Amino acid sequence: MSTVTISDTPFVGNDRLLVGIVLSVLTFWLFAQSVINVVPAMKSSLDISLETLTLAVSLSALFSGCFVVASGGLADKFGRMRMTTLGLGLSIVGSAMLVVAQGPGLFLAGRVLQGLSAACIMPATLALIKTWYEGRARQRAVSFWVIGSWGGSGLCSFVGGAIATGLGWRWIFVFSIAVALLALFLLRGTPESRSASASQHKLDVGGLLSLIVALVLVNLFISKGHGWGWSSPLSLTMLAGALAAGTIFIRNGMRKGEAALIDFALFRNRAYGAAVLSNFLLNGAIGTMMIASIWLQQGHHLTPLESGMMTLGYLVTVLAMIRVGEKLLQRYGARLPMMAGPVLTAIAIALISCTFLEKALYIGVVFASNVLFGLGLGCYATPSTDTAVANAPENKIGVASGIYKMG
């Protein structure tokens, strides 16, 4: 066995641990992500330009994506509980910064810490599930983990809009701090676990730096390219730099093998590779819901609460279908739900793109498309996540989970 557990007595995952894990995941997906729906409210009370505020909103996802694989490797090396605890601590500090922020400095720093928090929490908690749950118990635990991530992302617009409308947007992060503290309490007493073989390898600093450079340059190209001009020298420089850094990252990974930040041998498992690729594509598809929320506020003058209510259909269906997806997985295997989910999601994207429709009709179409999103993603989520976890080697479960969640 290549996973070391640090405990005097055998430990089996229980509901207390599972609730703590789900609450940990919610600190990012429910609270940190809710800023997407309250940008206008934050703009009115902060001394920050809209461009800077938009950058701040994307920073948490950017830093989470940059560091989630490295954090998964550190969880394998130093301990999954240790990284989960670190992530919750970063979430508390980052949320506190946002509560007191008046200008760009603290606000940007808080969003960065929230991203780093998510990078620590997501792979470490999936690794804890792989370590402490087996068989159907693992599939059930994965379902609830998925409810925390996919369900939290569906609820964040409504919760964020409701809190911002009723109490003010800063209270979103007060509640986030309270949830993080409760998660820390529930996770107390969980034995540590880590990979014996991972401790023999040093962190691949070169791979980490090249990955960060590639992701940052791609983000700048996508977010700033329109303003700079897609064919301007600056935009083309960003794109060329991203391609060069990506090439260096891949060559470094191929050369270092198991010692690389991402061991490309993981993708030899077709089931794991399919789960990672499809998860990447569907996570990108969720962006259409976020764009629709902003368009409903700025184009059709809905309030944050009203635009948040448009996602209730998604929330109900995704939460219902996540457990259905678990049952489909147990009865038919992962292939059927993992194929049906993207088809439903594609139909939802086509509907939500019909911005040329008259206001009342478009609002109805958006609500219906969100329902389809929930059906598709809920059907897909548990089979996909369980496939990634089940097919990851014990000594690389943190890294493998990080790669999966980087999407």
Task: Describe the predicted segments one by one.
Residues 165-279, 285, 310:
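Hydrophobic transmembrane-helix bundles of small-molecule transporters
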Residues 58-72, 122-126, 312-325:
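Central cavity-lining transmembrane alpha-helices of secondary-active solute carriers
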Residues 45-47, 79, 100-106, 167-168, ...:
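Helix-breaking motifs and short loop linkers at transmembrane-helix boundaries and internal kinks
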Residues 16-31, 35-37, 206, 233-238, ...:
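12-transmembrane solute porter fold
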Residues 1-30, 44:
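Cytosolic juxtamembrane N-terminal segment immediately preceding the first transmembrane helix
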Residues 42-43, 74-75, 159-167, 222, ...:
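Interfacial helix-cap and linker-helix signal at transmembrane-aqueous boundaries
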